[in-house]
């Protein structure tokens, strides 16, 4: 399995600044068994949020913590 933290940052870097990604995109990028990779992705996302490197949202609204469905974006994006 590839590092999920690096995969999040790499996928975001390939998108427009205001784009978001789905956590399952990250899991699919790092492991053939993407569902099995989801816990590692969630943990990596929690760390990236804590470090201020990404932000979370759902349906265009910011989320302060990961709970339920979410999208991952660059910090400061609306």
Annotated model-derived regions:
Residues 1, 36, 76-78:
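Long, charged, low-complexity intrinsically disordered regions
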Residues 1-20, 40:
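Positively charged, polyanion-binding regions of nucleic-acid-associated proteins
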Residues 59-78:
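Short, cationic-aromatic polyanion-contact patches
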Residues 18-29:
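Short acidic, hydrophobic short linear motifs in intrinsically disordered regions
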Residues 36-57:
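Charge-enriched amphipathic alpha-helical scaffolds
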Residues 11, 29, 44:
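Residues that form generic nucleotide/phosphate-binding pockets
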């Amino acid at each position: 399995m590839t590092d999920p933290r690096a995969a999040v940052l790499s996928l975001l870097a390939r998108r427009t600044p205001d784009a978001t990604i789905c956590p399952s995109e990250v899991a699919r990028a790092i492991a053939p068994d993407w569902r099995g990779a989801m816990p590692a992705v969630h943990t990596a996302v929690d760390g990236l949020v804590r470090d201020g490197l990404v932000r979370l949202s759902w349906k265009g609204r910011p989320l302060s913590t990961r709970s339920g469905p979410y999208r991952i974006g660059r910090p400061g994006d609306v």
